[in-house]
């Protein structure tokens, strides 16, 4: 057993013991709250892995124009661009989860993120995304400036963040300002303005616009932790903070991600603003705005017609289980997510807006497109929503923030959804959303644990930051808990990701089957997904 796995199992056991004690005390005083554990994408994901649908009898085919597979950021961005250009005869198959990693959690009148919870203010290079936000009324003016004007109600409200450090809460997530931290952030200010010998920004979002200068791209040959050590950074608090940022954005720590990715996180957006765009339900709010803007209409079932035509784009609750391209169309076998009924569509063009690891399992002759099964590491996450019938008691002088982080924790902290509500009085009930990136062992080993772990162990991981902040008394406020397991939540930008041959091949492919996903950038943020969605839509329109 390797050291990483021993460390992971030891930490699991320690947290489980602490959680068991916390639960025992809670059970003695209260009835345990309902707990739902959702393994998102199962069992369909394993059926696709095992090629369960390749020999399925085919139903009668129906013809359609443009078909989008998926409903995450790339899919809805592609649909936004198509409808903006007048292409409205579009079918969107939602995929296994509505809105993908931007899903919402809903409990009665309460809303919270079920996945991604914020959008950083987009860089000047994110032209299409800025246009999209302007279309939605979120970006009010200055779309071409360094920092445009955004609608105040869409920006994170104060207090934005706090860190529990040495037994006390403080405002900033960086624990201390010391010589190392000042040196590091002075470097970041220079890197924000740095250009390679080809004249392009060294660090840009979208990442494909970054410089290809070999001297800078050499950073992609070592890990961020190795680079930090080489450059003489020793401050424990700075190193913890940088590792936390990597886990928060990439699902893996500084010892696992590329040095280029580690610096890109801080330098790519160019502007100095730390504000973000967010809503109570996270990026599900943005997804819903895009659905409404695009006029996307849900259909319980497709009409029984040989040729399908729609005046407005329609959405069906189905997932692609097989894709085959021919000379004059793309044949897609869809499975209804509820009934399991199979539908066969022959589309003139298809935008495949799903993770590349999934596309490699469902596309016939996947290697033709550069898709290779088993390539790329994906980080497993827990996104856990704690429904509270009252707010936990804060210490004297302490104020709950939107983002609440515990120094030294294996978790990523918790989000208070109610922070974004516009109201005079604090609501009686609320939701705290806890995030955990499980990077303590090899992702495959973690996924095996996630499949078999008892609910109490999962809850222990989910609740570790909340019990660290409030102690056992936290459970007295808990009404219910929902744990979403995202076993392949995001692609990890490990050393070598900039020159990944698979990604280069898929990006270069041109045919009736277009790929659009943040995976094409080697890491997962909304800006990258939106970029690839718009790129795919432009190729659809160019082919007529």
Regions found by a protein language model. Name each.
Residues 1-16:
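N-terminal secretory signal peptides and thylakoid transit peptides that target proteins
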Residues 14, 20-24, 28-57, 166, ...:
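Conserved flavin/dinucleotide-binding core of flavoenzymes
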Residues 75:
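N-terminal Rossmann-fold NAD(P) dinucleotide-binding loop
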Residues 203-319:
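Active-site/ligand-binding neighborhood in enzyme catalytic cores
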Residues 316-432, 469:
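Mid-domain catalytic core of redox enzymes
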């Amino acid at each position: 057993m390797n050291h990483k796995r021993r460390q992971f199992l030891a930490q699991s056991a320690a947290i489980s013991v602490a959680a068991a004690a916390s639960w025992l005390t809670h059970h003695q005083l209260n009835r345990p709250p309902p707990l739902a554990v959702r393994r998102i994408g199962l069992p369909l994901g394993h059926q696709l892995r095992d090629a369960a649908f390749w020999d399925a009898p085919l139903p009668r085919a129906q013809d359609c124009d443009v078909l989008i597979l998926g409903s995450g950021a790339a899919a809805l961005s592609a649909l936004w661009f198509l409808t903006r250009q007048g292409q409205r005869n579009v079918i969107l198959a939602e995929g296994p989860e509505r809105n993908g990693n931007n899903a919402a959690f809903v409990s009665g009148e309460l809303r919270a993120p079920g996945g991604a919870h914020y959008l950083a203010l987009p860089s000047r290079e994110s032209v299409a995304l800025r246009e999209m936000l302007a279309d939605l009324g979120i970006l009010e003016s200055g779309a071409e400036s360094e920092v445009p004007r955004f609608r105040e109600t869409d920006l994170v409200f104060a207090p934005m963040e706090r860190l529990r450090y040495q037994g006390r809460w403080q405002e900033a997530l960086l624990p201390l300002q010391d010589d190392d931290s000042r040196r590091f952030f002075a470097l970041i200010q220079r890197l924000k303005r740095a250009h390679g010998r080809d004249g392009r920004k060294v660090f840009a979002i979208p990442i494909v616009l970054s410089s290809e200068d070999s001297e800078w791209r050499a950073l992609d040959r070592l890990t961020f932790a190795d680079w930090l050590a080489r450059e003489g950074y020793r401050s424990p608090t700075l190193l913890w903070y940088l590792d936390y940022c990597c886990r928060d954005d990439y699902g893996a720590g500084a010892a696992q991600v590329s040095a280029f990715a580690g610096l890109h996180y801080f330098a790519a957006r160019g502007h100095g603003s730390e504000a973000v765009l967010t809503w109570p339900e996270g990026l599900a709010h943005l997804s819903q705005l895009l659905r409404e803007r695009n006029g996307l209409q849900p259909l319980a079932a497709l009409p029984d017609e040989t040729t399908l035509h729609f005046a407005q784009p329609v959405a069906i609750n189905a997932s692609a289980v097989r894709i085959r391209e021919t000379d004059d169309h793309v044949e897609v076998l869809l499975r209804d997510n509820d009934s399991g009924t199979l539908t066969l569509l022959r589309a003139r063009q298809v935008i495949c807006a799903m993770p590349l690891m999934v596309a490699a399992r469902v596309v016939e002759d996947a290697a033709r497109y550069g898709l290779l099964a088993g390539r790329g590491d994906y980080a497993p996450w827990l996104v856990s929503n704690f429904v509270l019938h009252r707010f936990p008691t804060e210490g004297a002088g302490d104020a709950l923030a939107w983002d609440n982080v515990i120094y030294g924790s294996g978790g990523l902290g918790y989000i208070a959804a109610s922070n974004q509500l516009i109201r005079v009085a604090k609501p009686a009930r609320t939701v705290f959303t806890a995030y955990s990136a499980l990077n303590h062992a090899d992702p495959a080993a973690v996924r095996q644990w996630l499949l078999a772990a008892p609910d109490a162990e999962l809850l222990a991981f989910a609740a570790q930051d909340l019990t660290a902040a409030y102690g056992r008394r936290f459970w007295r406020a808990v009404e219910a808990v929902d744990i979403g397991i995202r076993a392949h939540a995001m692609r990890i930008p490990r050393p070598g990701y900039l020159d990944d041959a698979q990604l280069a091949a898929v990006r270069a492919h041109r045919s009736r089957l277009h790929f659009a996903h943040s995976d094409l950038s080697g890491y997962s943020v909304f800006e990258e997904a939106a970029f690839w969605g718009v790129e795919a839509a432009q190729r659809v329109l160019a082919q007529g």
